């Protein structure tokens, strides 16, 4: 993405009064694009600063806000005061001050359709959604995150506005496009004219289907436009690692076709007797990794509770680690954001700016209110992790370009959109425990994936469904997938998660499994994911592989 933007700017294909729009999925990623361009452009052109100013970098919501700042008055004159708006999601209690339960149902109807990726239902409910925004929320300087996109789409339906931006942005380039939902899809469609539009993405890394990421979004565009498809065939991450390169190729093949693969690869798999042995083995490995090098290691789990016993053993052994095993729906997670946003606004006051003193005051105020965030000592780890991410955010924000007002808006957006987990790449701890979904976009030298058991990874939902439709060979302590016709979508969703997990490793990935007794005193079965045709196992000991 960076190279393409730099190349087009260097060639002079973007005239002086036009721009490039680069869109990504987080504020942090947007900042990194700007930084990378600043490093690369001086190698290609003189006076590189003037070229950098020709690139607008944003995520979907940031871009929507920019449109509304400039033209929102054409929809509702209150958008003139957009910088004073509170931005919330549909579940925020603030909305109860302005709307009825009937109005709330209208907002939730769109959110439900969005998560289900139901385009027809979205068309049915979007006007009702807009009416609630326009008559109840916008006049009170409140808007939802979905509402930002709905408003921007409505604005771009005005021919003068959309025509201007199709000409203004001579190139639109979007990263991680496979995670785009219907509102993002509609927004992008309004920017396509005779300009160059580039979508970058990888279908096998689409792991946010439960949030509404559109299935087969690249195929939708192939049907609609004369698309030129460019496939990247070289995996530079694993170019010096033949084992991981082969594993990448094998797992990817299961995302592309629904049949036993023609490829072969091996994976490091340790088979242990029970949960205790598995947890002890993992902790021993972590200890060896961090004491023999400066390398970092992540334990990636399918669900947060699978990592809790490992966290307990690390604590007892005195090994420092960053614990990000909480869920986005946890009370402590939600309460932290409520307190952090409140204190951030209090610290900044009415200035709409974020200076260093304000950020320090915010951190201290959040620390003083920590007892509001967690109710038991066992849940304090959520507060500790979130507080550390908030510290990292404030520290990294010093490096951002722009004014203190820009800084305020970016921090406010990250907090409001619950985006602190994107700051995990900047933490100092050499050991991280987190979920696979939270790890997307991050890398560590070593990755450990525990609990490669049926009902753990894949999830219980897939395993139960698979058995009901007879799509598995269900053995005493193993399970093999049979590629039943009704299981393709669910299977590929789990393959995508598996692929994301193994490709977080830069040097090596280690899997563990045990066939001890489960909570019902039945023997655990190994996961069908480690029994895939073409995948062989390497037993390993830490003394040999580290």
Which functions belong to the PLM regions below?
Residues 56-62, 143-147, 151-152, 429-436:
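Conserved two-lobed SF2 helicase motor
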Residues 345-515:
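Conserved helicase C-terminal RecA-like lobe
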Residues 1-73, 499, 503:
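P-loop NTPase Walker
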Residues 169-180, 184, 203-204, 452:
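Conserved Walker B
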Residues 6, 186-265:
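Conserved RecA-like helicase ATPase core segment
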């Amino acid at each position: 993405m960076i190279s393409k933007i730099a190349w087009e700017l260097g060639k002079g294909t973007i005239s002086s009064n036009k721009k490039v729009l680069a869109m990504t999925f987080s504020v942090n990623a947007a900042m990194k694009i700007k930084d990378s361009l600043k490093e690369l452009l001086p190698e290609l052109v003189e006076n590189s600063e003037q070229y950098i100013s020709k690139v607008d970098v944003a995520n979907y919501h940031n871009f929507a806000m920019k449109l509304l700042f400039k033209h929102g008055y054409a929809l509702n004159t209150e958008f003139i005061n957009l910088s004073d708006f509170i931005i919330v999601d549909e579940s925020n209690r603030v909305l109860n001050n302005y709307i009825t339960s009937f109005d709330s149902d209208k907002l939730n109807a769109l959110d439900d359709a969005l998560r289900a990726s139901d385009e027809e239902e979205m068309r049915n409910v979007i006007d009702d959604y807009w009416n609630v925004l326009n008559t109840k929320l916008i006049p009170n300087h409140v808007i939802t995150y979905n509402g930002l996109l709905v408003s921007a789409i409505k604005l771009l339906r005005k021919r003068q506005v959309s025509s201007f931006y199709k000409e203004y942005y001579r190139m639109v380039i979007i990263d991680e496009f496979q995670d785009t939902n219907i509102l993002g899809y509609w927004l992008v469609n309004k920017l396509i004219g005779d300009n160059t539009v580039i979508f970058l993405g990888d279908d096998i890394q689409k792991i946010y289907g439960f949030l509404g990421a559109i299935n087969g979004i690249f195929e939708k565009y192939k049907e609609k436009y004369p698309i030129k498809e460019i496939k990247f065939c070289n995996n530079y991450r694993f170019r010096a690692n033949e084992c991981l390169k082969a594993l990448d190729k094998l797992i990817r093949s299961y995302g592309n076709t629904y049949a036993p693969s023609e490829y072969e690869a091996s994976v490091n798999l340790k088979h242990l007797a029970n949960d205790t042995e598995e947890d002890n083995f993992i902790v021993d490995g972590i200890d060896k990794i961090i004491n023999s090098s400066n390398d970092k290691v992540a334990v990636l789990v399918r669900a947060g509770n699978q990592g809790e016993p490992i966290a307990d053993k690390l604590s007892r052994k005195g090994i420092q680690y960053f614990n990000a095993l909480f869920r986005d729906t946890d009370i402590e997670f939600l309460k932290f954001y409520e307190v952090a946003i409140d204190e951030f606004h209090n610290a900044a006051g009415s200035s709409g700016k974020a200076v260093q003193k304000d950020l320090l005051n915010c951190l201290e105020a959040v620390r003083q209110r920590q007892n509001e965030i967690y109710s038991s000592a066992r849940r304090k780890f959520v507060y500790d992790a979130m507080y550390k991410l908030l510290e990292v955010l404030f520290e990294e924000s010093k490096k951002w370009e722009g004014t203190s007002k820009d800084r305020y808006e970016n921090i406010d957006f990250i907090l409001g959109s619950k985006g602190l987990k994107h700051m995990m790449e900047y933490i100092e701890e050499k050991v991280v425990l987190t979920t696979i979904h939270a790890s997307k976009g991050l890398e560590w030298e070593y990755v450990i994936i525990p609990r490669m058991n049926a009902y753990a990874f894949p999830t219980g939902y897939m395993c139960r469904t698979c058995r009901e439709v007879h799509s598995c060979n269900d053995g005493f302590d193993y399970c093999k997938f049979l590629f039943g016709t009704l299981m393709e979508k669910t299977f590929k969703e789990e393959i995508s998660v598996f692929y994301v997990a193994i490709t977080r490793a830069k040097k090596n990935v280690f899997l563990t499994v045990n066939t001890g007794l489960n909570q019902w005193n039945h023997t655990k079965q190994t996961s069908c994911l480690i029994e895939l045709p073409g995948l062989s196992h390497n037993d390993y000991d830490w003394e040999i592989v580290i």
